[in-house]
Amino acid sequence: MNQIKFVSNRPWLNEKSISTPSPVSKDIPDWFKEADRFYKMPDGEYAIMPDGGKVPTWKACPALLDVMTTGYFLKTPCDIEFFINSKNEIDVKVENPMMNDFCTKRQPMPQFEHPEGYYKEHFAWFPDWAVELPDGYSALYTHPLNRFDLPFFMTVGIIDNDKVNLPRTMPFRSEEHTSELQSRETIS
């Protein structure tokens, strides 16, 4: 049977740790859950199509539902703060000293495009968990899909986790303002 196995990179972590990966379907954001499946008029009544059916919204799209419920999330193990340091540069503080290497500042990538509205300086997640996959399988590591509410944007990559299940860094850029991520926030 083909299975995804998560291997802890830290000896003290287990399946009950707050950073334990979880199925995306168990961590659907509130804004998605609370969105209306059918369009409402300004008076609160549902809009009706000529055939008498309700007018669907984006939430009724099966392709969007599949994206919002497929895969696994990697998460932050503690609170993380992005701030402007005394050199007037974006910096990061990981609130738990045992997890200081979870998020680190990286060397510049001058020839790699960066999205508008994000700092040119970039960081990397060093996840608490590695992924082990059956022979012939690879994993797509991406910014959490359709999560425009997060204050960072991750670089996307594919890793052959059937051959490599060592911890890997996952580069990302922070939005051009200070922000804080709470523990258990999804990062990939």
What are these regions, as identified by a protein language model?
Residues 1-167, 175-179, 184, 188:
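Non-catalytic terminal segments and appended small domains
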